A protein has these predicted regions:
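The feature captures the beta-strand-to-loop junction immediately N-terminal to the Walker
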Residues: 34-36, 301-303
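Helix-to-loop junction immediately C-terminal to a conserved catalytic motif
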Residues: 49, 316
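Conserved ABC ATPase "signature" region
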Residues: 115-133, 371-388
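Conserved ABC ATPase signature
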Residues: 137-141, 145, 392-396, 400
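Catalytic Walker B motif of ABC-type/P-loop ATPase nucleotide-binding domains
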Residues: 162-165, 417-420
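H-loop/switch region of ABC-family ATPase nucleotide-binding domains
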Residues: 198-199, 452-453
Length: 499
């Protein structure tokens, strides 16, 4: 189904993203592709549907054939009926006014009769479990909901090969199970060939019969899933997270040990009182109360669409509450907003605009008169950006862009750092280095609010967990109802592994 021979892809500056790579994938295979951030995984995905070379400034050599045709001899539109590609950032491929319009766009452009367009959109909605979103505005969806819509839109084209670039990175447990269950069904019932790019191996690894590990533009390892997963030393050296067997995942509670629920005695940095907020007539948050104190490392968890990003936007001053109050500590009120709070968006492209990585990291401090070359060097180094400092941020992988955005925020030394789903595009090694550095800052007073669906990250770093449910925040402590509900959600997450 996929035949790649001696593929080399070079971006501006002679940077080889893919280096003499050859690969065959047979019809009906389910292949998991993983590797360190920036190793060329997403570039390879874009070669499969013709975006490279037809819609990219990258230079391509070698041959890529899918379903018997060469990608260089077909247009991107022609390849869309053979290869469906779902990007890491779903917002970059959604443009329909409603979800139904989005799913119908591709089939309509194939010239299909209206009844078949309806049949295809209905199938895609059901397959991804988003029938309830059919009439929703795509711009008003959460990131996780957008991801599922992007997958459904690709499915409506009925491709023979489905390529997904970190499709579960922004999904909650229910969404992850729905997407992976859909992929298993599509392969089983329709013989679809599936290539999934992931850093989190447990879930996708349970479905894959083959694993590819890339490094520096080459296929380093290629073999059966169990055989590759046994090579733990190689995985560790590459910064790849070891897959957790289901029984190990179920035995690990949210907290590794009991954590006291009493506060640290310090006055809150920021306090939300009786907040009601949303984007239309129906509020997302209702009578929400939340306080974050210095030296706290707080995790905010909850389903997609629960309002976690809305909380982040309120704290960052990007959204005004419809009712209630967001009050900062009196010692911080006179500081510019960028010194009080730093928000890492889910989509790093929304906060990158300079020509080089170094300029991006220095931009904030330069404008506030806070530049410290020593601190900038430390941050660039910890973020793993030393060798990329003169590169254009827009030419980097999503994982690298995420670290550039985080470094630019840390350079301003905000009192409160908010990380909204920081795992997208990150291998475990890069993520651990950054999180360990943040933990050291936390020990010196830095307050951190982590928004994530990754419970391994929560378990390792958070001191306190808050569950956002039905528009309100609940404190999660051992023995409480919210604590039991979260662990029950984890159990449901791994049901898909034995499906």
């Amino acid at each position: 189904m996929i035949r790649i021979n001696d593929l080399t892809v070079t971006y501006r500056g002679d940077h080889k993203a893919i280096d003499a790579l050859s690969l065959n994938v047979e019809p009906g295979e389910f292949v998991l592709l993983t590797g360190p951030s920036g190793c060329g995984k997403s570039t390879l995905a874009r070669c499969l549907n013709g975006l490279i070379p037809h819609a990219s400034q990258a230079a391509m050599a070698g041959e890529v054939r899918v379903d018997g045709v060469s990608t260089t001899e077909q247009t991107v539109a022609q390849m869309a009926t053979r290869v469906g590609l779902v990007f890491q950032n779903p917002s970059t491929q959604l443009f329909g006014s409603t979800v139904d319009d989005e799913l119908a766009f591709g089939p309509r452009n194939l010239g299909l009769p209206p009844e078949e367009v309806v049949e295809r959109t209905s199938f895609a909605l059901a397959a991804t479990g988003i029938g309830h979103l059919r009439e929703r505005d795509t711009k008003g969806l959460s990131s996780g909901e957008q991801q599922r819509v992007a997958i459904a839109a690709v499915l409506s084209m009925r491709p023979k090969v489905l390529v997904l670039d970190e499709p579960t990175s922004n999904l909650d447990l229910k969404g992850t199970k729905a997407v992976l269950g859909t992929l298993a069904h599509l392969r089983r019932e329709y013989g679809l060939t599936i290539l999934i790019i992931e850093h989190r191996l447990s879930e996708a690894g349970a479905l894959a019969d083959r694993v590819l590990i890339m490094d520096q533009g080459k296929i380093l390892l290629d073999g059966a899933t169990e055989a590759i997963f046994r090579q733990r030393e190689v995985l560790s050296q590459l910064g790849i997270r070891h897959p957790e067997p289901p029984h190990e995942a179920l035995s690990a509670e949210i907290y590794p040990e009991p954590v006291p629920v009493e506060q640290n005695g310090l006055k809150p940095l920021v306090e939300m009182s009786g907040v009601e907020a949303g984007y239309g007539s129906e509020p997302v948050l209702r009578d929400l109360n939340l306080a974050v104190r210095p030296q706290e490392f707080v995790a905010l968890v909850g389903d997609n669409g629960a309002g976690k990003t809305t909380v982040a936007r309120l704290l960052a001053g990007l959204l005004k509450p419809q009712q209630g109050d967001v009050a900062w500590n009196e010692n911080l009120r006179r500081l510019p907003l960028g010194r009080k709070v730093g928000l890492l968006f889910q989509n790093p492209l929304q906060q990158l605009f300079c020509d080089t990585v170094e300029e991006e990291v220095a931009f904030g401090p330069d404008n506030f008169g806070l530049r410290s070359d020593g601190r900038l060097e430390t941050i660039i180094g910890v973020a793993g950006l030393s060798e990329l400092r003169q590169r254009n941020p827009f030419a980097l992988s999503v994982g690298q862009q995420q670290r550039v955005a985080l470094a630019s925020i840390l350079a301003l030394e905000p009192a409160l750092l908010i990380l909204d789903e920081p795992t997208m595009g990150q291998d475990w090694g890069s993520l651990s280095r950054v999180m360990d550095f943040l933990t050291s800052l936390n020990g010196h007073g830095q307050a951190i609010l982590l928004i994530t669906h990754d419970y391994k990250l929560v378990r390792r770093y958070a001191q306190r967990i808050l569950l956002l449910e039905d528009g309100k925040v609940f404190s999660v402590a051992p023995g409480t109802g919210p604590f039991r509900r979260l662990n029950k959600q984890k159990e449901r997450q791994y049901e898909v592994l034995s499906a």
